[in-house]
Amino acid sequence: MNGQAPTALRYIDWLLTFPLTILTFYVMLKSVTDIKRGMFWRLLVGTLVWVIAQLLGAYGYMSVTLGFLVGIVGWLYIIGELYMGDAGRANASCNNERVQMAFFANRLIITIGFSIYHIGYFIEHLAGGANINSLNIIYNLADVLNKIIFGMIIYSAALEDTKKGNQN
């Protein structure tokens, strides 16, 4: 492989899974509190700005540096929404411990774990590159943390919430 196929597949994956992952915050909060639909759109747009900018940079449709910077802005916008925006405030004021725990843990994954994707982009496109196989291993390990563990946290919170609801 020339490196293009893994990159293309990676971005197809990210265009599908990153918005779903980020929108999980909206779904969690919507299940326990009254929130406005605008949060959904802000999270979706922030995620798409991030992924599409870096895709365009990776494929040369825009400057690699600009793709990196715009992608970082999209990611930071999401983080801002989760910590200081409506999502963060809704989580802080909701009365569901399991949602608050899942929100907190998954917000850390978005903050720390998703930085791996930006570091990989930087290494691959701005720092002279790296072995494509090494990058694929790093991205696959990041996917385990950022997608599978993220999902397991949601599942665990929902399971505990269901058990608690059945006891009342």
Kindly label every feature range from the protein language model:
Residues 1-10, 18-168:
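Polytopic alpha-helical membrane-helix bundles and their juxtamembrane interface segments
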